[in-house]
Amino acid sequence: MSELGSIRESIIHLCNKFPNKYWRELEKTKGYPDEFVKVLSAEGFLSVLIPENFGGAGLGLEAAGIILEEISRSGGHPGAFHAQMYTMGTILKHGSEQQKQNYLPAISEGKLRLQEFGVTEPA
């Protein structure tokens, strides 16, 4: 099986542990999927786009897309995971070396969640 096929099978297996009832309850209570996020972090799915030298998997957008696709297919809402996976790209592209060292390993380990960021532009 290819690496991407293995990723797909792994995320399907993980998503099957969180039935529709889990997602419906979160929607009803307007809750955040903390338990699901913890498992995704522990399994390394939220750090697929972070380079290996910062503790991530160093995979590409196709792997990230597969993960989000299978979360959606299983009945989950990928919004919270999309933010975690993609907004750290701002640190990779525009962050100082110190910021990369401070934040990316912690994101990779699931100790830090980066859900949003602000942008300012000169007037």
What are these regions (language model features)?
Residues M1-K17, N53:
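Flavin-dependent oxidoreductase catalytic core characteristic
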Residues N20-A123:
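Glycine-rich flavin
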